Amino acid sequence: MGQKIHPTGFRLAVSRNWASRWYANNNNFAAMLQEDIGVREYLKKKLKNASVGRVVIERPAKNARITIYSSRPGVVIGKKGEDIELLKSELQRRMGVPVHVNIEEIRKPETDAQLIADSITQQLERRIMFRRAMKRAMQNAMRLGAQGIKIMSAGRLNGIEIARTEWYREGRVPLHTLRADIDYATSEAKTTYGIIGVKVWVYKGDTLGRNDAPVVEEVAEEKRPRRNARPGGDRRPRRDGEGGGPAGARRGAPRRAGGAGDGGKTGE
């Protein structure tokens, strides 16, 4: 079922994290969830030209902390920080608690699934051919380090009468592998002949799970030569009875017949 399930929900608590990080009892949960949805819709409209990829909402101890991930943080902040202050006051009015807003820059917008999907939908609304927009996005993502990408568009493509679905893939996108870092996003293009949906999967490589440790290759230590080693190398292994004792002491040697005064000669 890796092809059908939501890639982010499938990997929650394994390699992905939640977009809303707070706890609530049964009485307040629905209201707080609806509040988060309203905040995200407001930020999507307000920061339409700021290339916002993700919004993370946290609620620590009667406060709210909102982190906005954008590839154009200057547009969010505005001249001398005026826009960010207006945004903060509006969010405080909507949420009813003090709000802290953080801006994080997306270093590679070409490999962010949400920004890719939004870029394709904007091109479709400007009547650019969908195949050209999809293939250009795939080439840019692969050029900047993505290991695989898949893009699917569905609807009345190019204004045809019957809706259809087309998708393209480059590289590999392992949807069943839990340790695979799959970035997934969707977007909609509102055209004159209907809505066109765009889905994007970006494979950025494997990530370490909670119980995994990084694999370090063992480097074999160089064998240092002994100080008094013979030039020929190590000695050959000794046989039984060799070395360490008097002559004739090895096992199985014939005993002398003569005494000590016969000069060591054997009896004739």
Swiss-Prot record:
Extent of Low complexity compositional bias: 248-257
- Region feature Disordered, mapped onto this chain: 216-268
* Ranges of residues in domain KH type-2: 39-107
Biological process GO terms, please? translation
Entry keyword Coiled coil? no
Q: Which InterPro entries match?
A: KH_dom (IPR004087), KH_dom-like_a/b (IPR015946), KH_dom_type_2 (IPR004044), KH_sf_prok-type (IPR009019), Ribosomal_S3_C_sf (IPR036419), Ribosomal_uS3_bac-typ (IPR005704), Ribosomal_uS3_C (IPR001351), Ribosomal_uS3_CS (IPR018280)
Assigned GO CC terms: cytosolic small ribosomal subunit
Q: Which UniProt keywords apply?
A: Ribonucleoprotein, Ribosomal protein, RNA-binding, rRNA-binding
Any GO molecular function: rRNA binding
The domain of life for this entry's organism is: Bacteria
**What segments bear the compositional bias annotation Gly residues?**
258-268
UniProt xrefs under SUPFAM superfamilies: Prokaryotic type KH domain (KH-domain type II), Ribosomal protein S3 C-terminal domain
Q: Please list the residue ranges that the record marks as compositionally biased, kind Basic and acidic residues.
A: 232-242
Its subunit composition reads: Part of the 30S ribosomal subunit. Forms a tight complex with proteins S10 and S14.
**Stated family:** Belongs to the universal ribosomal protein uS3 family.
Q: What does this protein do?
A: Binds the lower part of the 30S subunit head. Binds mRNA in the 70S ribosome, positioning it for translation.
Q: What is this protein called?
A: Small ribosomal subunit protein uS3
Q: What is the scientific name of the source organism?
A: Paraburkholderia xenovorans (strain LB400)
Organism ancestry: Bacteria, Pseudomonadati, Pseudomonadota, Betaproteobacteria, Burkholderiales
Per UniProt, what is the name of the gene that codes for the protein in this document?
Answer: rpsC
